[in-house]
Amino acid sequence: MFYRIIFFSFLLINISCDIKSDELKISQNDSLANFISSFEEYTFDESHTSSYIYDQDKLHRFDIYLTDENLNRIDNDPAAEEYVEGFLVFEGKVIKNVGVRYKGSIGAWVGCLSSPDWINPNGYKICPKLSMKININWQGDKKFYGMKKLQFHSQNLDKSKMHERLGYYMYRNFGINAPRSNHALVYVNGEFTGLFANTENIDGPYTNQHFDGGGGNLYKEVWPVNSEGESRSDEYFKNGLKTNE
């Protein structure tokens, strides 16, 4: 299985370089609303499981659609990590009114924002791609293959595009609980954005999937000091607590 992942990933990295985006592209004479209405709306079914999304033998394609206004909004300040309304198309079906934003910690923004201050990331987007998060239930209680969120990691600093997928795969095979990850092709408004790591989001559905009962508290890591080297406040650490959804 390990060698199959390496071989498969080598192929998809080379294949993805030549991908054209003729399909699912909005024509000049069409509006986004009309274009989206041409798709059947996705409906969650109990037979839809997240195992399909993270199948190691699949190279899924995800199409994200945003108005020009919303795309410009997140492009102008990615580090704000502000959700805007968008649409997700997967295998010919659309999930409407999802939240779309860029995501990342300090390392994800290095060399990708107009400001050179990597400690306090700010400025507009200058990289071809950035990591993204899709909030399926941003408006209404919706699920996509049993999940509430998707995340696509740009891996801009990883020339192999393999570290994340292989790392999590090895952890799981060592018996350590870790997110599932494969690769995905991501398009934004019909344009090929790149090859991303499609990595499982750690949230309520994740704990339900991987831990018996899924109850308890879920913590997100927090950086212990600020840019001045001073310790964070107690309140800052409390805000790092994420309760299960």
Language-model region placement:
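Sec-dependent N-terminal signal peptides
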Residues: 5-13
